[in-house]
Structure formats: structure tokens, C-alpha cells
Swiss-Prot record, chain A:
PANTHER family: DRAB11-RELATED. It is found in: Cell membrane. Involved in auxin-mediated response. May be involved in vesicle trafficking of components involved in polar auxin transport. Binds GTP and GDP and possesses intrinsic GTPase activity. It comes from Arabidopsis thaliana (Mouse-ear cress). CDD domains: Rab11_like. Keywords: Cell membrane, GTP-binding, Lipoprotein, Membrane, Nucleotide-binding, Prenylation, Protein transport, Transport. A motif (Effector region) lies at residues 42-50. This is Ras-related protein RABA1a. Plants overexpressing RABA1A show reduced growth of roots and shoots and smaller leaf sizes. One of its GO terms (biological process) is response to auxin. Disruption phenotype: Slight increase of primary root elongation and lateral root branching and hypersensitivity of root growth in response to exogenous auxin.
Length: 216, 333
């Protein structure tokens, strides 16, 4: 953590996780959002990686801390620890592989088993640039998202379609919940989530308020 | 058996002819794994060259023709062997020596035809998973770069064969980087048996726990690393605790791929030299790297000698027992 500055200024720190089957494009969505890069020849993710990006959401400076997890089933032993404290999740499937969409239900169960019920989840159909290979119809995914109360978007990390939009939408929805909580006057601490602590979006610690600038 | 490698990137690589590669075959424009920053000898002087020649001659003598003298030498002078391995196995002999010290050469000789059988006649439930990762394994290395080229085909064969050989483990992401590293130094069949020697345990404890359901051995190593950091570098341990950094965040991929995934390539090779012969993961090196980071932490010639001065073996054994006691399902012996 060379050069880390504790006094870096932001109003909120939101922790997000990227989940979904192996090879759906999680790492490239992350690098497109945080560095505006796409790599056709990237390595498989082993274990976990993370990146951050600071952005403005409804006038507030929000730092997104995004955890990118390996998709293979066997890794669940390590990756599920990263769900803890997450206030947002992007559940990603590959629009050209129907099996990755069918697995979304399982990923969702897994996620909900480890996180607060108020977590903001967006279903993402990635690789939508491959139009001639689409195997998952938009309507089908939309219906699933509605049934499960998820936000939904189709993206392409390759040509950058909707990537910024998807992350911004998730961050905005989280911010809405948090600021509503502030107005309601719910007590919040300014600590990072501790180990083993259950995070509640309503009274959480992981939705970090900084500098006291927006507490009232 | 061992493939010809390019020297200093001036000659052509085996797969593509005019792409500049470093002396290990990684594309030059790629920074990940590139040894450029860490290799001291950018311009090899003639004295360096002579020293290298002498070293190779000593090694050849020690090994004998095709490894015939090796066992004898190890028995007679274990300390000399150990010292020489710690200084780094000459690159041109690395593949052969790795097979000798891991015990994989014996496995190969005892199982004629088995590898071919596994590759040609058996089918694996993991085939699609393997294929999905093939082009995502060392994508910046000339040998693995070409789609369906010899590198990718060998990698597929070795991984598929292993997934059939041990259906409990099957294929787990990360194994590809180990197989890939081996394939840069030996033939497919040799790489397969070294993988078997490593995971099933030929001359040392099996490491298949890295890939079993629940990744028990990875969890054990993470626990040990965390404990050692707290004990040996208390200030850093404290800082990690405060920032809620736990070792699974930075070290899972080190253990799952035995350092072949993201370490600078020359360092990964030197770690493998010692790891295969001394039969343990280089916790000393990790501790040392964390202590000195970032200056010089990734230069093998600086890191390794200093790391040997840190003694952790005894404490590691204690921590292994402690971990196994506190976990209901112990790591398979």
C-alpha cells in the first residue's frame, strides 16, 4: 500500500462485488470502469482482486471499492468471504452462453445468504457487442430481474457500452438508500466493517461517511 | 527434450518471428512478469559469461549423463547440492533437475504409456472449463500466445490428463499456471508427471489440498502466513489488522499457483528451484519481501539470500498442528 493516504477525501466508501461464472467478463468490466482499459488477452482471475474508483454521485464524492472474484465453483471457499459488508453487487452473465444465465439464480442465492437484504444488485448481460451470437434474450433476462427485484442492464466491456452507466446506477441506488437513512436520522458509525460483523445497509459501517461533512 | 529458448530477445521466438521477447519468452511490451526491472545482468559481461559456464560445468558433473549420477551425489554431498540449488539452477538444466529433485522422473519410468492413455482415450468432465482458461494462461508468453498452437495444445493435454488422473480434484483454475511454467522447461509427459509428483507427493507431502473442495491447504497457508506476519513483523501485522487486510486478499493467488501467477518470472523460477528441493513453501521469502517492500523486494539475488537468514521452519510446523487442531476436518496428510 505504498503512497496510501488516509486523508483522501470522499464522502462515502461503497463496497461492491462482482460475481458470476468464470469467463463472463468480470475482470474486464472492472478494468473498463476503473481504468478505461480492455484486454483481450487477460489472465484468468485467481482468488480475488480489487480496484477502486472515485466518482461523483448526486453531488457527493463516492469511492467505490470493487472486489473481483474468481468464478469457479471451487473458489467459493475463499470468495464468499468478500460478500461480507458489500452494499452493492453486479451479477454478471455472458449473453452468448445461456448456461451462465441459468447459473444466475444460484449466484443470487449464494449472495443473499451472505449479505444484507438491502444490498443493491444489478443483473448484467455482458458481451452484448457479440450480437450475432446472443443466446440469452433481453426479455428473458429482464423477466428474471423483475421477478427477483434486480436492476438490469446489458453491457459490453469491449466497446464500453453501458459499463459506466451500470456502475453509476448501482452507486446511485446505494446512495439513495444511504441518504434516506441519513434523513431518517439513523445512527451510523464511521468505522469500517469489522470481521464477522453483519452489515446492514440501514445502520451499516461499510457505507462510510467521511469528514463528517454530510452528517446532520 | 528441453525447448530452445531465445537469448536476450535478439533472436526469433519459436512461435512468432519478429516480436521482441525477453530471455524467458515474455513479450517485451508486457510489464506483468517481465523480469527486465529485476535482472541485474542486462549487458552480460564476459566474466559473467565465464562464471555461468563454470557453473553449468559443475552442475553437469553433479547430474551425470541423463541424471545418472544425481542420486549418488545427493546422498554423498547433500549440503553441496542444497547450496548450489539455493544459488539457482542453471536455466539450461532446470527442467531436468526439477524432474530429478521432485521424484517425477521415477514416476514417469514406472508408468509407461499411462500419460498417452489419459490424453487420447479418456474424457474429462472439466474439458470445457480447461478450454476456457487455455488462452488466459500466460497470454503474454510467445509459447502460449498462438491460438491452438503447440503451447496451448500441450497445456490442454496436461490439464485434461490430470483431471482424469485425479477426478476428485479435476481441474481447478490456477493449475494451468503451474502446468504452463513446467511446459516452458520440459515435455508434456514430463510436465504431467511433475504435476502428479507435486500434488500426490512423490518425495514429499502431497499438495493436492491446494485444490480440494474448500481449498484446505490454501487456508492453512494463509493462516500460517498471517500468524508469522503478526509474530515477526508486528508493526505490519498491526497495520494490516487496522486496515482490515487479511492475507487471502493478497496471498491466495500466490499459494494457489505456487507463485507462478504474478511474481516476476526470474523470481518465480528461483522459488521453484528451492521449493521443489526443500519441499516447503518459501514463507521466509514472503516475510522478507513484506519487510523490505518495495525496495528490491522482487529481485531474486537480493531477496533469496536474505530470506534464508529468517528461520521459520519450527514455528511453521507448530502452526500447522495448531491449524489442524482448530479445524474440524484436518488437511489430508
Amino acid at each position: 500500500m505504498a503512497g496510501y493516504r488516509a486523508d483522501e477525501e470522499y464522502d462515502y466508501l461503497f463496497k461492491l462485488v462482482l460475481i458470476g461464472d468464470s469467463g463472463v467478463g468480470k475482470s474486464n468490466l472492472l478494468s473498463r470502469f476503473t481504468k478505461n482499459e480492455f484486454n483481450l488477452e487477460s489472465k484468468s482471475t485467481i482468488g480475488v482482486e480489487f480496484a477502486t474508483k472515485t466518482t461523483k454521485v448526486e453531488g457527493k464524492v463516492v469511492k467505490a471499492q470493487i472486489w473481483d472474484t474468481a468464478g469457479q465453483e471451487r473458489y467459493r471457499a475463499i470468495t464468499s468471504a468478500y460478500y461480507r459488508g458489500a452494499v452493492g453487487a453486479l451479477l454478471i452473465y455472458d449473453v452468448t452462453r445461456h448456461a451462465t444465465f441459468e447459473n444466475a439464480a444460484r449466484w443470487l442465492r449464494e449472495l443473499r445468504g451472505h449479505t444484507d437484504p438491502n444490498i443493491v444488485v444489478m443483473l448484467i448481460g455482458n458481451k452484448c457487442d457479440l450480437r450475432h451470437l446472443v443466446a440469452v434474450k433481453t426479455e428473458e433476462a429482464k423477466a428474471f430481474a423483475e421477478r427477483e427485484s434486480l436492476y438490469f442492464m446489458e453491457t459490453s466491456a469491449l466497446d464500453a457500452t453501458n459499463v459506466e452507466n451500470a456502475f453509476t446506477e448501482v452507486l446511485t441506488q446505494i446512495h439513495k438508500i444511504v441518504s434516506k437513512r441519513s434523513v431518517d436520522g439513523g445512527g451510523e458509525s464511521a468505522d469500517l466493517p469489522g470481521k464477522g460483523e453483519t452489515i446492514n445497509v440501514k445502520e451499516d459501517g461499510s457505507v462510510l461517511k467521511r469528514m463528517g461533512c454530510c452528517s446532520n | 527434450m528441453s525447448r530452445k529458448r531465445t537469448e536476450n530477445g535478439s533472436e526469433s521466438g519459436p512461435a512468432t518471428s519478429h516480436v521482441p521477447v525477453d530471455r524467458f519468452g515474455f513479450l517485451k511490451q508486457e510489464h506483468a512478469n517481465s523480469p527486465e526491472r529485476f535482472s541485474k545482468s542486462k549487458t552480460t559481461s564476459s566474466t559473467d559469461h565465464d562464471r555461468e559456464e563454470r557453473k553449468v560445468r559443475k552442475w553437469r558433473k553433479m547430474i551425470g549423463v541423463g541424471g545418472s549420477d544425481w542420486k549418488h551425489y545427493v546422498r554423498r554431498k547433500p549440503n553441496v547440492v542444497r547450496r548450489r540449488i539455493r544459488k539457482g539452477i542453471p536455466d539450461c538444466l532446470r527442467g531436468l533437475v526439477w524432474q530429478l529433485i521432485s521424484g517425477s522422473r521415477d514416476l514417469l519410468l514406472m508408468n509407461p504409456g499411462v500419460y498417452e492413455q489419459l490424453v487420447i482415450y479418456e474424457t474429462s468432465a472439466s474439458e470445457l472449463d480447461i478450454i476456457r482458461d487455455i488462452s488466459r494462461t500466460f497470454p503474454s508468453h510467445v509459447f502460449f500466445q498462438k491460438r491452438h498452437g503447440p503451447g496451448q495444445r500441450s497445456l490442454y493435454n496436461v490439464l485434461k490428463a490430470y483431471s482424469v488422473y485425479d477426478r476428485d480434484v479435476g481441474y481447478v483454475q490456477g493449475m494451468g499456471f503451474i502446468a504452463g511454467l513446467l511446459l516452458l522447461y520440459m515435455s508434456e509427459e514430463d510436465a504431467f508427471w511433475l504435476l502428479v509428483a507435486l500434488l500426490k507427493g512423490a518425495v514429499h507431502a502431497p499438495m493436492e489440498g491446494l485444490y480440494h473442495a474448500g481449498l484446505p491447504l490454501v487456508q492453512q497457508y494463509l493462516f500460517q502466513l498471517e500468524s508469522l506476519v503478526k509474530e515477526l513483523i508486528p508493526k505490519l501485522g498491526e497495520h494490516f489488522t487496522q486496515e482490515m487486510i487479511n492475507p487471502s486478499m493478497y496471498a491466495s493467488q500466490w499459494f494457489i499457483t505456487v507463485f507462478s501467477y504474478s511474481f516476476p518470472f526470474p523470481l518465480a523460477l528461483r522459488i521453484w528451484d528451492v521449493f521443489l528441493s526443500e519441499v516447503k513453501l518459501p514463507f521466509e521469502k514472503l516475510i522478507h519481501a513484506l519487510k523490505t517492500f518495495p525496495e528490491d523486494a522482487m529481485n531474486p539475488d537480493t531477496l533469496l539470500p536474505l530470506a534464508y537468514s529468517i528461520k521459520v521452519s519450527k514455528r511453521l510446523e507448530e502452526l500447522t498442528l495448531e491449524y489442524q487442531k482448530t479445524n474440524a476436518k484436518p488437511v489430508q496428510p
